[in-house]
UniProtKB/Swiss-Prot annotation:
Organism (species): Borreliella burgdorferi (strain ATCC 35210 / DSM 4680 / CIP 102532 / B31)
Enzyme class: transferase
InterPro entries, A to Z: 4-PPantetheinyl_Trfase_dom, 4-PPantetheinyl_Trfase_dom_sf, ACPS, Ppantetheine-prot_Trfase_dom
Protein's name in the database: Holo-[acyl-carrier-protein] synthase
Keywords associated with the record: Cytoplasm, Fatty acid biosynthesis, Fatty acid metabolism, Lipid biosynthesis, Lipid metabolism, Magnesium, Metal-binding, Transferase
Length: 124
């Protein structure tokens, strides 16, 4: 194991995201936003969980960085794998760094009414 990252977020922080398109587009890719629209259940919990996942990855990568990389949270996309679990799809500088370092990323997300939590393990 190279590094870990964890983030916990209050779900209620994301209630106003649904009415604020600019906020949504600041943190989430168009693909993520479309998936939220198609998703049943609690969209707000899902938003919070994906945001926590992005923050967890940043925390996990930070100790590995030998140089500053430019990124936005939209460069870290959280998608559903063919198996149904959450995984990352990286873009731009974050993707280049992960490839250069030959990193393997493992993600788990959980949410329950008030809180969402994500945990990331980084290996190479």
């Amino acid at each position: 194991m190279k590094s870990i990252g964890c983030d916990i977020i209050k779900v209620e922080r994301f209630k106003n995201f649904l009415e604020n398109k600019k906020k949504m587009e600041r943190f989430f890719t168009h693909k993520e936003i479309e998936n939220f629209k198609l998703k049943g259940g609690s969209i707000i919990e899902s938003l919070a969980g994906k945001f926590a996942a992005k923050e967890s990855l940043i925390k996990a990568l930070s100790p590995l960085l030998q140089y500053k990389i430019n990124y936005t949270l939209k460069d870290i996309e959280v998608i559903k794998s063919l198996k149904g679990n959450a995984e990352f799809c990286l873009h731009n500088e974050v993707e280049k760094f992960a490839i250069k370092m030959n990193l393997k990323l493992y993600l788990t997300i959980s949410h329950e009414k008030e809180y969402a939590i994500a945990f990331v393990i980084v290996e190479n």
